[in-house]
Amino acid sequence: MNPPPDESRHPTLRPPPSTTLKIARVTLSDRASAGVYEDRSGPEIERVWAEHGGETAEWVRVLIADERAEIEATLRRLCDDERCDLVLTTGGTGPAPRDVTPEATRAVLARELPGFGEIMRVQSFARVPTAILSRATAGTRGRTLLINLPGHPRAIGECLPLLLPAIREALRHLRG
């Protein structure tokens, strides 16, 4: 009898249909939150998730400005009160003074998982040398996995599929 396929080697394998994750996608943008332009990064997270075999999800959608205190409060609420399995942020990871997503994320994490940010930088750097400026990170708070994704929709499409096997594995560990 053959063992079941290893999902980490087959990222497009889907879990049983009864598996539903509660996922928050948090767009961090002063201009999008002020209505200057439409948020394209948040919807791109959902599109890429579905296209690349992400589990069935109940989505919590958040769009806020680059304000560290508000970001921290939002991340705590999503983890502690709303009990999201996964929180994916987009935006605010660059070197600009108002890019405070990594600092806000680290302030709420119990444990940092730096490999997520490292692989996104390596993957993106191959196409866009300025990707090295990203300060994205990831980690856990309680049973929630938090990941800072890039702010550009194209970069989300390049990075999120690479992370799916590790996301699944981390969520398995967090769920016990």
Where are these regions (language model features)?
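Non-catalytic beta/alpha edge segments that cap or flank active sites
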Residues: M1-G176
